[in-house]
UniProtKB/Swiss-Prot annotation:
Belongs to the DNA polymerase type-X family. It catalyses: DNA(n) + a 2'-deoxyribonucleoside 5'-triphosphate = DNA(n+1) + diphosphate. Error-prone polymerase lacking a proofreading 3'-5' exonuclease which catalyzes the gap-filling reaction during the DNA repair process. Specifically binds intermediates in the single-nucleotide base-excision repair process. Also catalyzes DNA polymerization with low nucleotide-insertion fidelity. Probably acts as a strategic DNA mutase, which gives rise to a rapid emergence of variants. Generates mismatched G-G pairs, in that case, the polymerase first binds the deoxynucleotide followed by mismatch formation. This is Repair DNA polymerase X. Keywords: Disulfide bond, DNA damage, DNA repair, DNA-binding, DNA-directed DNA polymerase, Magnesium, Metal-binding, Nucleotidyltransferase, Transferase, Virion. Consistent with its intracellular location, ASFV encodes its own replicative DNA polymerase and three base excision repair enzymes: a class II AP endonuclease, the repair polymerase Pol X, and an ATP-dependent DNA ligase. The keyword Protein biosynthesis does not apply. It comes from African swine fever virus (isolate Warthog/Namibia/Wart80/1980) (ASFV).
Length: 174
């Protein structure tokens, strides 16, 4: 367990240190492409882990980011890692914390931010209402009859409004 303040400090420390190896080169992950999600974004007082969403600029890089993740000046071990999710244990100020990393393409960002921020109860209500209209919402997009529904949105707030719901800041979601 860690406090919200500790979680925010860890994220600040990580922002300039995340990179991945690709074709023998170390590619820095830009701070603007790192989004705090989960209980940290909802500003819960106590956190079980730190959740970060990494926005990947090109589809061809997606399969390389998490399996080849590097954190400058941090000691870490990988519990499990795939193309879209990686669970790490990081050493920070003499303690070990769980860091969950997720990836999304730029066009998936609003959906992924909503999905990984939650909370689950909030997402269940939204998805249930959409299901009645034959839509499916997940971290990759909005679908109708298994076909992606293109929406001209770039933020989670725009997504919520486009779906016909009232936007609530993450810490006010139930």
């Amino acid at each position: 367990m860690l406090t919200l303040i500790q979680g925010k400090k860890i994220v600040n420390d990580l922002r300039s240190r995340l990179a991945f190896e690709y074709n023998g080169q170390l590619i820095k992950i830009l701070s603007k492409n790192i989004v705090a999600v989960g209980s940290l974004r909802r500003e819960e007082k106590m956190l079980n882990d730190v959740d970060l969403l990494i926005i990947v600029p090109e589809k061809k890089l997606l399969k390389h980011v998490l399996p080849n993740i590097r954190i400058k000046d941090f000691s870490f071990s990988i519990k499990v890692c795939g193309e879209r999710k990686c669970v790490l244990f990081i050493e920070w100020k003499k303690n070990t914390y769980q860091l969950d990393l997720f990836t999304a393409l730029a066009e998936e960002k609003p959906y992924a931010v909503l999905h990984f921020t939650g909370p689950v109860s909030y997402l269940i209500r939204i998805r249930a209402a959409l299901k009645k209209k034959n839509y499916k919402l997940n971290q990759y997009g909005l679908f109708k009859n298994q076909t992606l529904v293109p929406l001209k949105i770039t933020t989670e707030k725009e997504l919520i409004k486009e779906l016909g719901f009232t936007y609530r800041i993450p810490k006010k979601r139930l």
